[in-house]
């Protein structure tokens, strides 16, 4: 197959970007009268179960729905509420003091 030769694959879905000149074709669904009758009398049990799941999916990943600490922080990309609930590795001491590595370097003893 040469360069610029189509291998088939059907119509491009990028027509909305490049202006295909054609409106997208809608698929027509034909129902028989028996299908429409049975669907009109079907109990709405699946719809009720789907609504309960949808309310859970409304909370973004990594955020606990019961946490009140869901605000954006301007400290960097690795701050905020994590999915893993691991403790932070951020250094919490001022430069030059309060190091937890004194046991390695012999500091802290006068």
Swiss-Prot record:
Acts redundantly with SPR1 in maintaining the cortical microtubules organization essential for anisotropic cell growth. It comes from the Eukaryota. GO terms for biological process: cortical microtubule organization. Residues 28-110 are annotated as: Disordered. The modification Phosphoserine is found at residue 67. Keywords: Microtubule, Phosphoprotein. GO terms for cellular component: cytosol; microtubule. Residues 63-82 have a biased composition (Polar residues). InterPro entries: SPR1/2/3/4/5. Ubiquitous. Disulfide bonds: none annotated. The lineage of its organism: Eukaryota, Viridiplantae, Streptophyta, Embryophyta, Tracheophyta. Residues 40-52 have a biased composition (Low complexity). Residues 95-110 have a biased composition (Gly residues). Belongs to the SPIRAL1 family. This is Protein SPIRAL1-like 2.
